Amino acid sequence: QRGKPVWNEDILAFVPGGSLPQGMSVAGAANGTFGLSSILKSAYATTSELLSCLGFSVKFSDLPKAEDEAQSGTAFWHVREGRKRAWVDLQNDVTVKDIKLSYQEGFRSVEHLKRYSTLGMATDQGKTSNIAGLAILAECSGKTIPETGTTIFRPPYTPVTIGALAGRAR
């Protein structure tokens, strides 16, 4: 739907941004909400809204008693002083060195990095590697992740077993 996630520096993650497609809602950690109490409130509000849109009257019991614990995170995108290769995209064998080299070669755009290094072009479409790759490119350029930009995000997916891809054995 071309909805572009936005970077949330507080949680070091992308969250849904702008308007979601009609009928789509996001709650809890997928929406950047952490802490048990906050997640329960988010789930309650989102479920209530969805059910009322479907014409159901909503009557929930009281939410369970819970508290949010303080949460914090630290960005750790790669080991800076490692002596060996530091892999970023395991499916395409892209390393931190490859990303830094692409920047040195003048590939400053995220899309150029993607094509130069094949970062995020494997079967997972970058779902396991792009954030670390974007962070390393941002570090090279002295910019933030939002200033660096993103590639086009693919819709959520359900993993498929290797057996389903292999077909029948004879």
Annotated model-derived regions:
Residues 1-170:
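Residues forming the flavin
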